[in-house]
């Protein structure tokens, strides 16, 4: 049985390696940070857009606007978005903070083109 009254030993890490992202500016002027971390066959794409709580005119406006992105686009209704992401083993996280709204896509590398199509539609063609 574990004795919870005994404090565990504190171990200092031998070496802490912090990987720096590669910073690129796309032809359209959008900054891109690329971090190749690990051998996993998963890609994470984070989109940061100005539009957090500091820019909202009504309480919760930034949060609800961001969350509505998955509710439908010109090409896909909410059920089709969920179905396509689920089929390809991908998922979305939608959130907002003080300054920014975040859209994060996790996708298996082999299905990235298909899931990027859904992400593009969500960001460029929302219907709410």
Place the predicted regions along the sequence by residue.
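Acidic/histidine-enriched segments that form metal/cofactor-coordinating
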Residues: 2, 86-128
């Amino acid at each position: 049985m574990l004795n919870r009254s005994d404090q565990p030993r504190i171990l200092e890490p031998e070496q802490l390696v912090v990987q720096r992202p590669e910073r690129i500016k796309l032809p359209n002027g959008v900054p891109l940070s690329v971090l190749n971390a690990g051998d996993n066959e998963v890609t994470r794409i984070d989109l940061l857009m100005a539009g957090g709580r500091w820019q909202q005119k009504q309480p919760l406006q930034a949060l609800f606007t961001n969350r509505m992105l998955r509710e439908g686009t010109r090409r896909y209704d909410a059920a089709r978005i969920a179905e396509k992401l689920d089929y390809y083993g991908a998922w979305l996280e939608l959130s907002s903070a003080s300054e920014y709204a975040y859209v994060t896509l996790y996708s298996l590398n082999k299905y990235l083109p298909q899931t990027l199509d859904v992400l593009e539609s969500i960001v460029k063609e929302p219907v709410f």
